[in-house]
Design a protein with these regions (language model features):
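A common structural junction motif
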Residues: 476-487
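Interdomain boundary/hinge elements
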Residues: 311-316, 373, 384-388, 486-498
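Conserved catalytic core of nucleic-acid polymerases
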Residues: 331-447, 452-453, 464, 497-514
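Short, conserved charged micro-motifs
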Residues: 465-472
């Protein structure tokens, strides 16, 4: 045991020496200090836990599961059984001149009078609709006008193998043989894909989507039940302060970043969203405070573009005057963009690296029209054009980009580079702001419990004194502005403590503070 202890010390020392140049480099000092402090904060949030309304969660779960069996019966009636080919059979004879029964074991009566040697026939069976079968789901939705764009991992890997010049001929041939299957069935049954089902689709297809959403809600609740602590009445999730490749925080046990949220454009697909978010709450006599960064990814994009018109639009533009970014983006996209809401959906998808297929689904247009709209949008902002044509290719060629705080983030993909800039920038700003407001509240001697940190949002539990809660919210929101100034960004950052209904984000549960 002592030898292993000595070995651990030796390995750690060699590891330290390996990274010493980076550790002592001025470029990394700010990032290293931030991430080391975030380790402590992540552990603190895990230990605090998030209060959870288990009784209401069980009621919702029972309500959801009680709808599934009747809905499955309705769908089996709406989608009649289909004839499924099991195999092609060529009857053979035995040495006695009779047909071999090897290929007829499935027959109940054993009557082979309708079959003869060498006469090929198809062995089929009726297949009832199974709402749990991805293949059958895709078949029925495709027939209803579904236009999915999110591929499964298998489909993506198949395409990579075909394009990989290092793949062996056998590997490439195998992938090419599987490609027709993936082209038909290689689509995720995800919310984004389900949203592409037209509103005019036949009722059975829409009921199928409803069933899929209910089942997803039930799975999420099951995950929460498994994580619930009966002693503390809380869920103690794990926060990995640098879990994603963009160095955003990741969450597991359960994934507290994957809580349903309302979708104004698809209210029928937001079922139970508010009710499930409301399960995350506070004990009696306490308040929950929600603070987030105002349009942080658009502001970071404005920083990188350094375009005065876009910066003004993001920070001061209004929907009423038609000077906000979503209205301007609608004009930049051209006639194919029918509404401001579509322009809003487009920009956030574009920032995450959406391809032409996804843009086509968002705008409800052809692939050719989507490509023209995207190109029009990029060309309308010189700063964005410079990013796309010069900065991104340069960073992809060198295999990394430099973050706002000096850290190097590995990325050699032009397709993912813009999302990397924005998500890493968001992570840097929000982490530094979290550290800053924690220090300030300690200085002010204001007690609080930090219970969640998701991307650009914090949830904090505090006393039921509204003045204290408002002070906490003000300190948190102001920390975002201060960090933006300290990083010397081209576009000002701002925090907000208003919820989605534009009222003060102080309440009894997460649905009231989000």
């Amino acid at each position: 045991m002592l030898r292993y202890c000595q070995q651990d010390v030796e390995v750690n020392f060699k590891l330290y020496k390996h990274f010493q140049r980076l550790i002592e480099s001025p470029l990394w000092q700010r990032a290293l200090r931030t991430e080391h402090e975030m380790v402590t904060i992540s552990k603190e949030m895990h230990d605090n836990g998030f209060y959870f309304n288990i009784d209401e969660a069980r009621r919702i779960f029972n309500e959801i599961t009680g709808q599934l069996d009747p809905l499955d019966a309705e769908l089996r009636e709406s989608f009649p059984p289909r004839l499924k080919l099991l195999r092609e059979i060529t009857p053979k004879t035995t040495k006695f001149g009779t047909l071999s029964r090897t290929d007829f074991r499935w027959m109940k009566d054993g009557d082979l009078s309708d079959y003869s040697e060498g006469a090929v026939f198809s062995h089929c069976e009726w297949e009832p609709f199974n709402p749990g079968s991805p293949r059958q789901i895709v078949d029925r939705l495709n027939a209803a006008g579904w236009r999915p764009y999110e591929k499964t991992k298998g489909y993506i890997e198949c395409l990579r193998t075909i394009r990989n010049k290092w793949a062996s001929p056998e590997e490439r041939q195998k992938a090419e043989d599987r490609l027709p299957h993936y082209e038909k069935y290689g689509w995720k049954v995800s919310k984004d894909n389900l949203d592409t089902l037209p509103a005019t689709a036949p009722l059975p297809a829409r009921r199928l989507v409803h069933r899929l959403l209910l089942a997803a809600r039930a799975r999420t609740l099951t995950e929460w039940f498994n994580a619930y602590n009966e002693q503390t009445h809380r869920i103690h999730g794990t926060f990995n302060h640098i879990g994603a490749w963009t160095q955003r925080m990741s969450h597991n046990g359960p994934n507290m970043a994957n809580v349903p949220t309302e979708d104004p454009q698809h209210p029928d697909r937001s079922i139970y969203s508010n009710a499930m978010r409301a399960l995350w709450s506070v004990p009696l006599g306490r308040n929950l405070i929600g603070v987030d960064a105002e349009g942080i990814q658009l502001r970071i994009l404005a920083h990188y573009m350094n375009d005065r018109r876009f910066i003004h639009s993001v920070t001061s533009g209004t929907k009423e005057e038609g000077t906000d970014p979503h209205t301007l983006n609608k004009l930049a996209l051209g006639d194919v963009c029918k509404s401001r809401d579509d322009a809003k959906t487009f920009i956030y998808a574009f920032l995450l690296g959406a391809g032409v297929e996804k843009i086509s689904a968002i705008l409800g247009c052809t692939l050719a029209e989507a490509k023209i709209a995207r190109d029009n949008f990029i060309a309308s902002y010189p700063g964005l054009l410079h990013l796309k044509q010069d900065v991104i290719p340069r960073d992809a060629a060198q295999g990394y980009f430099k973050g706002l705080d000096g850290r190097f983030v590995k990325c050699n993909s032009e397709h993912h580079m813009l999302a990397g800039y924005l998500q890493n920038g968001e992570a840097v700003i929000m982490k530094e702001a979290r550290i800053l407001w924690g220090r300030e509240l300690k200085r002010l001697q204001i007690p609080y419990l930090s219970v969640n940190f998701v991307h650009d949002e914090w949830q904090t539990e505090a006393s039921d004194d509204l003045d204290v809660c408002r002070k906490i919210a003000e300190v948190q929101a102001d920390a975002i502005r201060i960090v933006g100034e300290d990083l010397d960004l081209n576009c000002p950052m701002a925090g907000s403590f208003l919820n989605s209904h534009k009222s003060l984000a102080i309440g009894q549960n997460w649905s009231q503070t989000h």
